[in-house]
Amino acid sequence: MSRVLVPCHVKSTVALQVGDMRTSQGRPGVLVVDVTFPNIAPFELQEIMFKNYYTAFLSIRVRQQSSMHTAAKWVTCLRDYCLMPDPHSEEGAQDYVSLFKHQMLCDMNRVLELRLILRQPSPLWLSFTVEELQIYQQGPKSPSLAFPKWLSHPVSNEQPAPRLEGLPDPSRVSSEVQQMWALTEMIRASHTSTRIGRFDVDGCYDLNLLSYT
């Protein structure tokens, strides 16, 4: 199925502090990133792609247009998705990630805005985020191709092939050729190997006595 890149605006991250920032123990453990789609009508989200940068867990909330008469609501569509199996090691820290709509907890129709919530509980990393964020929506369906009738309805092997006008029946021709071949073999087998003697009549040859085989 085709997909189309959706133009988006990624706002600056907002850090939620953990601990007292006036001490060395205080550091941001949660980041919030809002993604808006200016001048884009509500759309069906197909895929989210990004490059991780030391984010251990990802949650996503989506603001959807429910109807024309009610206000849009925020819904959690992904909760604590693991990007780093061990937050204290490098595994998965800088991987490219693709998330599809079938992985979400809700329908991804009529999307107006996204909110990414990034968590990194390990104190080993000075910073974390997501990079190269791309949002895709479902593209137009490909038009169906019309196949020729002879491709759509192939002739069965059990059906006899149509005869061509003016040509003999192939099976009859084959039978006659087989009979002619058998007759030729019989004549060849009965042909004598004795040489025909000379016929001398009054010192000359009579051509009428020559045998043609």
From Swiss-Prot:
| Xref: InterPro entries | Nicolin-1 (IPR040235)
GO CC annotations on file: cytosol; microtubule; nucleoplasm
Q: In which tissues is it expressed?
A: High expression level is found in brain, testis, liver and kidney. Weak expression in spleen, leukocytes, small intestin and colon.
**Bridged cysteine pairs (disulfide):** none
Which UniProt keywords are given for this protein, alphabetically ordered?
A: Microtubule, Nucleus
Provide the protein's localization. Answer: Nucleus
UniProt KW Nucleus keyword? yes
Superkingdom of this entry's organism? Eukaryota
Does Transmembrane helix count among this protein's keywords?
no
PANTHER family per the UniProt record, alphabetical = NICOLIN 1, NICOLIN-1
Tell me how this protein assembles: Part of the neuronal tubulin polyglutamylase complex which contains TPGS1, TPGS2, TTLL1, LRRC49 and NICN1.
- Return the protein name: Nicolin-1
Q: Which organism is it from?
A: Mus musculus
